[in-house]
Design a protein with these regions (language model features):
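Sec-dependent N-terminal signal peptides
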Residues: 4-14
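Sec/Tat signal peptide C-region and signal peptidase I cleavage site
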Residues: 16-20
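Conserved beta-strand hairpin/beta-sheet module of binuclear metal-dependent hydrolase folds
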Residues: 21-77, 166-179
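Active-site-proximal beta-strand/loop segments in catalytic clefts of secreted hydrolases
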Residues: 37-40, 52-53, 59-62, 86-91, ...
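Active-site metal-binding motif and surrounding structural segment of the metallo-beta-lactamase
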Residues: 54-55, 65-106, 210
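Accessory terminal helices/loops
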Residues: 108-109, 116-118, 209-214, 221-277
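Metallo-beta-lactamase
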Residues: 23-29, 63-64, 105-230, 237
Length: 277
């Protein structure tokens, strides 16, 4: 996890600030709607609004002021009260608003590596970044369920090795994690060692067993079940080749052969170095 923080901070420092030109995507889940906001910020963040007939819930609202302006203006146009602001993995949103967080995240975000990362963002983004949240914070214990206007939010403990946030099952139809499954090769940041691949496979299997229709992440946005199935098959291939190939170079060659043209080949040497160390 320490490597994740360092890599993310370095990425942001080199990329600089991108002015907000985000986009929204809406999914109708019958008794509620999910609004996914792709920020186009340097971190590749996504933020979410769950809309019911009588209110709204935000999840991991944007960190940068331009994005927050787009996001909050959009929310106002829905003409409904925001009942809860959930901070799961990412700080952001109205700094003075009351927030709901998974157990332990209030402390985790205020000290150590997370706090250092946020202070680094403050130095890099300056006045383009919102103040950090200072409003009252209520924590939801793992295994407990929040109910808002008939939509349930079940908080389950996130996989080991990443942020100690929650996997949130929304309305028994949507599964929220830190990063959504995707179609690209894994990166050195997501696979710091072989155990991380095992953890990812286990979590994808849980995702498919959850009965959810949509899988969302504060990085990556919203994807369907087919993307989850494809990533599971891919990671099982990674796991098999890791046992089969004796060297890092042979592993990279075999993975490229198995998935010709797959996005992210440039990351494979670092992935192999991590997995074979």
């Amino acid at each position: 996890m320490k490597k994740f923080f360092l890599t993310l901070a370095m990425m942001v420092a080199f990329m600089g600030v991108v002015n907000a030109q985000g986009r929204f995507e809406v999914k109708d889940m019958d008794n509620f709607k999910l609004h996914t906001y792709y920020t186009n910020d340097p971190m590749g963040d996504a933020a979410f609004i769950v809309e019911t007939a009588n209110g709204l819930v935000t999840i991991d609202a944007p960190l940068l002021k331009d994005n927050w302006e787009e996001f909050s203006n959009y929310a106002r146009e829905l003409h409904k009260h925001i009942d809860y602001n959930i901070i799961n993995f990412h700080e952001g949103g109205d700094p003075k608003a009351a927030t709901m967080r998974p157990e332990g995240m209030t402390k985790f975000m205020s000290e150590g590596m997370y706090d250092s990362m946020m202070k680094g963002f403050q130095q890099n983004f300056g006045d383009k970044m919102l103040d950090r949240p200072s409003g009252p914070s209520t924590e939801i214990k793992f295994g407990e369920t929040l109910n808002s206007n008939g939509v349930t939010y079940k908080f389950e403990q996130a996989p080991a090795g990443g942020f100690p946030g929650a996997t949130i099952i929304i309305g028994e139809k949507i599964r929220h994690t830190h990063s959504a499954p995707n179609e690209a090769h894994i990166t050195g940041m997501s696979a710091p060692n072989a155990a991380a691949v095992d953890v990812a496979i286990d979590d994808l299997q849980k995702a498919l067993a959850s009965g959810c229709e949509l899988f969302i992440g504060s990085h990556g946005g919203a994807v369907n079940k087919a993307v989850v199935e494809n990533q599971l098959e891919y990671l099982q291939t990674v796991q098999r080749l890791l046992k089969q190939e004796k060297t890092a170079d042979a592993f990279v060659a075999a993975l490229k052969k198995a998935y010709p043209g797959k996005t992210g080949e440039d990351s494979l040497p670092q992935v192999a170095a991590n997995l074979y160390k």
